[in-house]
């Protein structure tokens, strides 16, 4: 199982970015959670058995690749810090409130 934690900076809150992340993750079969942090960043925990899908998902989050021709229309990602992570397995991908 491949698991990562991403901290996404830029204009990523209040612009539908978390919903874009959810749609993109579900299309790729990625499981995990996404939420807003108090410092204006968005945090993502993502897991999959397929390393290539995780790389594709990371590229979509960074804005380097579109998800089925879509990019997050109002978000402006300026930085993504990604690192391997250890967390309990998820069975879906949703927003954590």
From Swiss-Prot:
Location of the active site: 18, 36
Gene3D superfamilies in the record: 3.30.70.100
Class of the enzyme per the UniProt entry, highest EC level: hydrolase
InterPro entries per UniProt: Acylphosphatase, Acylphosphatase-like_dom, Acylphosphatase-like_dom_sf, Acylphosphatase_CS
All residue ranges annotated as the Acylphosphatase-like domain in the record: 3-97
GO MF terms, alphabetically ordered: acylphosphatase activity
Annotated keywords: Hydrolase
Origin: domain of life: Bacteria
Enzyme Commission number, as recorded: 3.6.1.7
PROSITE patterns registered for this protein in UniProt: ACYLPHOSPHATASE_1 (PS00150), ACYLPHOSPHATASE_3 (PS51160)
NCBIfam families the record matches: PRK14434.1
Official protein name in the record: Acylphosphatase
Organism: Lactococcus lactis subsp. lactis (strain IL1403)
Origin organism lineage: Bacteria, Bacillati, Bacillota, Bacilli, Lactobacillales
